[in-house]
Amino acid sequence: SESTISRTQMKMKKRVPIVINGPYSSCARYVLDCKHVVLIGGGIGITPYASILSSLMAQFRASRVVCKHCNGINYTSKSLVECRRLKKVDFIWVNRDQKNFEWFLNLLRQFEQEQEYYLASNENEKRFLDIHLYFTEIKHEENIGNVPLDLITKIWAQVAGEDIFTSLKSKTHVGRPKWDEVFGGLISGENASTANDVNVFFCGPSTMAQTIRNHCATYRFRFYEEKF
């Protein structure tokens, strides 16, 4: 009938709203466009930066050459760091205890070793990666027996040449970061960056994000937050 056809035509002409969302890019994609990046993760918030560090380490390894005669290590690129804009990475991970670090420590150990090889064969190069780990469950004033924990960690590092908690060359800090000291150190001392060069990327709890955002504003660092 005409009425049936009319209703069918009206349904066909009716506009159906369509909403298209995403994909949304991550702020981490800007990392390689920066000169000096500070990657900060709170707990599992470090996950977005694991792949970045893994990729950077792969670039070092891809250009590594081992001599068949003497097993000496060299790199095919004159300067890996000169070939890209990114010159320096500070990796900061704030976590409750050592157990939460275990899954990622192997990658950090490998990167430390790769950097040592690279610096040994390129004496004029500067350190590319600095690692800063924080255990928040342990306090500065804690003792092992009657001996201060801080003293034990220092002696162990001197004797063993590695951190007592992680076996990394980088020192593990106990307690929460003192952000004024951390950020102040980025723009002071030898080979320091300028505030304009420092870009801070963070992923973690919102309360921690606000604290870091405020300090970035004070030091005039660019701040990027990955949704936790």
Task: Give a label for each model feature.
Residues S1-Y30, G72-F228:
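Reductase modules of NAD(P)H-dependent flavoproteins
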Residues A28-C34, S63:
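Helix-loop boundary elements of multi-pass alpha-helical membrane proteins
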Residues K35-G42:
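Beta1/beta-strand and adjacent pyrophosphate-binding region of the FAD-binding site
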Residues V38, A50-L53, M57, L108, ...:
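Generic hydrophobic alpha-helical scaffold/packing signal
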Residues G42-K68, L80-I92:
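Classical protein tyrosine phosphatase
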